[in-house]
Amino acid sequence: MNKIPLLIVLTLCLFLSCTALAQTKRALVIGLGEHEDAAWNKINGDKDIPYVLEILNDANYEQIVTLVNEQATKANVVSALVSLEHSCQVDDIVYIHYSGHGQLMRDAGNDESDDLDECWIPYDAYRRPCDNDNGEKHLTDDEVNVFLNNIRNKIGENGKMIVVIDACHSGDATRSNDETVRGVEDVFEAVKSWLGFSSNEENSNIHSNTERWITLSACESHQVNVEMNNPVVGKLTYALYTKIKEKKLGDNNALFKEIRKFVNMNTGSRPQRPVMSGDDKDKYNITDILL
């Protein structure tokens, strides 16, 4: 009589064990310090990569894709995001990292309150409109949002996902010689025709910017993201690396407080405050993803 309940318990334990083993940690890491267009300010986003990889390897990530400098074209970044979506399974853990320039682009979809899209800058994106790039080489927040939501749909509500953006979407014309700023002050005036629509109603591919994950950003929207000098690395990347290596455990508020404290201690005269956002920031901990 007791054998049947015992068999049920053993079967349940085996099922739970298999479910846990099926959970896969996957990452996409993008870092740019070089660009096809020489007009971009020299930065060191590529030097963030080793620090990120050390964190991920320590956390036993099984699938890690890196795109560095000339590898990180718009087409390759999009392909990597789509491939990540296709490989993901329910309950997976996903880490996405972007270190590079950011730029504001005049919003072609009219979905932004200020008519400006925040863009990641792939290797083949140009700082100003030209024959090589009329805006199609920039990766807008609208596009990124679609890819990220597709990934979220694949991993399901119990999957965990974080996006780390060590960039800045506004620059500073007063940049000094001893500071390296990720971002530029000029707005890219996109040619709307390349998007294939002329009004918001015609654009069925632009989704509302739901954020069903945790996002760590290097600074607030009105601030600049200044790199560290020693070591030469992104400030948010190095803050996250340092605190994870120090095993700063606890909930997200505790870890983020440590990250902000580190950035503040390594910031000069201009303030830089990292931002934690996303619907999931109170649902699970960053340490669940990186430890």
Residue ranges and their predicted role:
Residues 1-8:
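Bacterial N-terminal signal peptides that target proteins for export
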Residues 8-17:
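Bacterial N-terminal signal peptides
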Residues 18-291:
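Cysteine endopeptidase catalytic domains of the caspase/legumain-like
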